[in-house]
């Protein structure tokens, strides 16, 4: 049995909301004046929002809130109750998941200063921890960001970033030369970045920290055909990766947001053996292989080439034809939109768990697109670049559902 905490997220949210109300009486004490919550997401409602237990896939959902003040990874049940917590030595950079051997594999954000420090997707360390949060080993890498995974051979595969050679950078199409936009994605560009371009490389690293394989985007992508697809994106970042996935044959699925590209890389030759790009996807995240051989993708949609309205959707792609064979999108389409991050997981019962990352919302849909479970992350924190208290965020890189048997096994082995 899993020890459940003696409080619910709903009760905590209610108590926190009541504690924050500033009340005063007027007109002889007959009128009650209360302060209105100024954080939009808190005001809309948090915690469990909907649940049909007979239609939702039974199990537990793991997630790590993405802000610097919290290093916890949470596991909740279908009722939104926290049933287990891992406390990590680093804030998330950006997520964690349970391994086949029952442990927690975690991407963390280190405090060391580097050119990645001004980006919210900075990483710096991956580690493996047991069920109680004890760190078994960790690997640091100054270029690591977004996502890393534990390979079947026991090594780790990391998304890393480095400067693109000048002769290649000059040929990359798209993007804005000057980018002074203030947003949650980029801190103000320091003068040192002027004229520079960074792009991704994959690094396979042993648990002892030895790099045994690398794959550099600028050596394989076409600067013209695979240019920066996002209209307002800075030229500072070319092929910035956000997800990596090991296929059964050892080949690698990787996703690159600024180029709106998903590729499959041959581990034997290093060649790109499959590619999906715009207009099918726009700023996508999290491609995974399904049992039927298709690929599931969270398609963010901030700069669509075939629609003037930004919206997100989840699509299932037949890689033999690159055709969409299933999709989920809201009605109207703009009701569901995460401009950054996002994830989709196909569940054993055929449903799909979707992470609308920017708003900390996880929801499960049937094949027909009906919502059978919905939860909004109630853990808020200040974003990495500060701001007033009302700017607190509850964003989550990805949420993952595990069966009751998987959690029991993880507790036993991990």
Give residue ranges: language-model regions.
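Histidine-/acidic-rich catalytic cores in large beta-rich domains
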Residues: 18-19, 25-414
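N-terminal secretory signal peptides
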Residues: 1-9, 17-23
């Amino acid at each position: 049995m899993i020890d459940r905490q003696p409080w619910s997220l709903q009760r905590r949210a209610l108590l926190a909301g009541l504690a924050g109300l500033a009340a005063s009486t007027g007109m002889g004490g007959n009128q009650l004046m209360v302060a209105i919550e100024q954080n939009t997401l808190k005001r809309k409602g948090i915690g469990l929002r909907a649940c049909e237990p007979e239609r939702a896939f039974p199990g537990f959902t793991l997630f790590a809130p993405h802000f610097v003040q919290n290093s916890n990874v949470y596991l909740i049940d279908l009722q939104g109750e926290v049933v287990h917590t891992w406390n990590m030595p680093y804030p998330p950079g950006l997520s964690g998941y349970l391994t086949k051997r029952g442990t927690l594999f975690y991407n963390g954000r280190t405090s060391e200063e580097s050119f990645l420090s001004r980006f919210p997707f900075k990483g710096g360390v991956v580690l493996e921890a047991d069920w109680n949060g004890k760190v078994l080993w960790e690997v640091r890498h100054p270029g690591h960001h977004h996502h890393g995974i534990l390979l079947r051979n026991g090594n780790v595969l990391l998304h890393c970033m480095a400067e693109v050679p000048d002769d290649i950078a000059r040929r990359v199409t798209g993007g804005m030369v000057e980018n002074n936009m203030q947003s949650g994605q980029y801190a103000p560009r320091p003068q040192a970045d002027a004229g520079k371009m960074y792009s991704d490389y994959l690094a396979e690293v042993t648990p002892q920290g030895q790099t045994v394989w690398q794959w550099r985007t600028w050596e394989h992508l076409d600067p013209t055909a695979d240019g920066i697809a996002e209209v307002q994106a800075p030229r500072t970042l070319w092929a910035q990766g956000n997800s990596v996935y090991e296929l059964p044959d050892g080949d690698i699925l990787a996703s690159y947001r600024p180029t709106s590209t998903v590729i499959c890389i041959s581990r034997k030759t290093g060649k790109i053996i499959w590619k999906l790009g715009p207009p099918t996807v726009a700023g996508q995240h999290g491609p995974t292989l399904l049992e039927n051989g298709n690929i599931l993708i969270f398609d963010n949609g901030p700069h669509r080439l075939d629609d003037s309205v930004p919206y997100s959707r989840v699509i299932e792609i037949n890689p033999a034809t690159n055709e969409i064979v299933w999709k989920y999108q809201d009605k109207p389409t703009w009701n569901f939109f995460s401009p950054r991050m996002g994830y989709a997981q196909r569940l054993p019962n055929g449903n799909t768990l979707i992470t609308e990352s920017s708003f900390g919302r996880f929801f499960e849909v049937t094949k027909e697109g009906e919502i059978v479970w919905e939860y909004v992350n109630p853990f808020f924190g200040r974003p990495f670049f500060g701001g007033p208290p009302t700017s607190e965020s509850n964003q989550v890189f990805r949420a993952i559902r595990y069966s009751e048997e998987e959690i029991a096994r993880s507790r036993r082995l991990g």
